[in-house]
Every structure is written in structure tokens, then in C-alpha cells.
Amino acid sequence: MSVQKISNAILGVGVDDTTIDLFESQYPVPTGVSYNSYVILDEKVAILDTVDNRATDAWLANLTEALGDRMPEYLVVSHMEPDHGANIARLAAKYPDMKVVGNAKTFVYMEQFFGPDAVAKERRVVVKDGESLSLGSHTLTFVFAPMVHWPEVMVSYESSEKVLFSADGFGRFGAVAKFDEKADWASEARRYYLNIVGKYGPQVQALLKKAAALDIATICPLHGPVLTGDLGKYLAYYDTWSSYKPEEPEKILVASASIHGHTRAAAHTMAEKLRAKGAKVVEMDLTRTDVSYAVTEAFRCGKIVLACATYDGFLFPPMESLLTHLKTKAFQNRTVGLMENGTWAPMAAKLMRAELEGMKNITVCENEVTIRSAANAAAEAQMDALADEIVAK
């Protein structure tokens, strides 16, 4: 990714990482990810955030091109997570006269990552919520966004060009060079949000309220494309996601965790029964689908059916993983149907119900499906009852 001209004074100097396979060592990123960084050229020059160590050389090349013969006066640190803050100490050493801008928590974490001497105290500009920094004709106002998704996070608003530098907010998986503006922004933005930030809905809601008071024409996130044009659609997505409301209230996810295929076959039969009743259904085999995609679809749908085999008296691990992730991400406000399978002692429904009881505003259907080895007429009758109940809710 080369230097990106956002305006005459604002440049993107981020880097696409197309060789990474797992973001945060857990989330598949088949089209890579971008680490975004920005430069504002004015009477004074500000760099906004650094990049991951994986992209240091390419980023420094972009930065050198963008700066020309200018020296930066400031490095603004929005977020200390290593995919954005890894090169702070390196940049501070490269430009010894540069000040580093952050809040009190920023510098606590900076010392934890790099030691107390990486950025001397006299080089630190410690800002408070709502304070501003003038660069000349451009002014950055700092808006604290704690727990979106780390405690020190802050976003920056540049008033003359109406640009919000949004930290991880409005980020998206995928290399920028591979993003087609006509493509579906929401798909990988949704997966990014729900798996990275999803736990912190109330904090995102608080940030959205602060942002509503700003006149924003451009959003510059730390991952993914710069957003312009009709920003309302992006804000609407974030409002829905952070409110834990389903995008498609009547859509039903049927997710199965099957050892030898019998539970999966029963789940498919259930899905077909739901479709016959006019429901919109998506099926997921948890043994063949990364959990991040299942989490995303569970949040997108208003209703889910979980079909799981009993395994050593517990849940088959792929289902256990999904429920753990959902609980971690504060999954709530949904209707859930349960299907279990066990040749001699089916326990999965009881165990899944117990997991769901720890989540907020989850309605578990009264009708359950119990399969002993393979579905038969009795199990199909139970499926019919569950299908009737969940479609009616």
C-alpha cells in the first residue's frame, strides 16, 4: 500500500499485510489486514499512530515519502495495542525532537511495553478528554474512548477538514488494496467489530453519542478503508451492533457440532423444516467453520438453534467454543432452540442451557430435541414442535 492522499494536508501512510493468516493469533484474515497510520502536514507535522512490527520497513518508507524534508513535531498515540503502537520507541529514537502525545494511561502502557526511558518525560504531551492541539490551520481535538476496546483509547477530530481519526472504531479485516468500494464493507467490518470490540457495546454507545456532536465528513480508522460519502450507514451499523440488536430479527442460525455426522444431519433436517415455514435460515457446521464467523452470524440473527453431540459427558468442543465466545462478547437479546444427541446419556441440552443462563435476555425455547444416535420419527416430531415455537417467537 503506497502513500494515500486523503486531502492536500492529510496523507495515509499505512501498510497492507497480505501474508498474515491469523489476526491477534486467532482470527483468520484470508484477504489480509491493513495497519493504518496518518500524517498531517501543516505549520507543524503530526503523525497519527505507528504500525505492527510486521510492517515496519514498508511503513517507514511510506512515512519518509510523505514527510519529504519535513521533521515531525508530534506523534499522536490513539491506541497502544502492538498492531498500532509497536514502532513508538523506534520512531522516538529516529526523531529525537518529536513530542509524543497521549493520555495518562497511554504512557503507563508505553512504559510497560518499552520501559521508562523510551520516551523521556519531557517529550510527553499528556492530554485530557476534550483538549486540543493546534498544528497551524489544522487542530486536533482528543475525545477519550475508554474500552473501545482498551482503557487508553482516544480518537482525534480535526475540525477544519471534518476528519475523525477513529482508532479501532470502524475498522475492518482485509487489505485496503484488495477492497472494492462497490463490495460489501459490512461483512468483514461486522466480523471485526463483533469479535474484537463486541464485548464493549455500552462504551461504543457512549462514543457514538460524543461523535454525534461532531460534523464528520471522513472517518480514518486504524484498520480498513478510509470512509467518506454517506457516513450514516456506517454509524447505523455501529449503533445496531453496539446495542446488541439483531440486524435480521427473523433470521435463524442453525449451528451444529457433530462428531460422526448424525447431529449435523439432524440440524439440516431442522433447517429444512424452518425453511418450509417461511423462515430465512443459515446453517453452520462448527467443526468446519472458524468460530469468529459463527459468532458474527449469531449476532446478526435474531434466533439460533444449537445442535450438539454429547462428548465425554460434556459438550462437543466446537459448541463449547462458540458458547464461550458468545458469553465473552456479551451475547444477549436472542431466542435459542436446543438440540442434543447422545447414544447412551445425552447431556448437551442441559449443558447448553446452563451456559445460556449466564447470558443476558436469552429466551430458551421450552421444546427441545433429543436424538439417540440418529434421528427417528420421535425426534422429527420434537423438531416440528421446536420449529413451530421458534418461528412463532
Predicted stretch roles:
Residues 220-248:
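Short N-terminal or domain-adjacent regulatory/targeting segments
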Residues 3-65, 155-158, 162-165, 263:
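Conserved beta-strand hairpin/beta-sheet module of binuclear metal-dependent hydrolase folds
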Residues 87, 290-294:
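Short acidic active-site motifs
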Residues 255-277:
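Short, charged N-terminal beta->alpha structural module
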Residues 48-50, 72-80, 99-103, 164-168, ...:
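Active-site neighborhood of phospho(di)ester-bond hydrolases with catalytic His/Asp-centered motifs
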Residues 43, 54-101:
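Active-site metal-binding motif and surrounding structural segment of the metallo-beta-lactamase
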Residues 4-8, 101-153, 200-206:
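Metallo-beta-lactamase
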Residues 176, 180, 184-219, 223-226, ...:
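FMN-binding flavodoxin-like domain, especially the glycine-rich phosphate-binding loop
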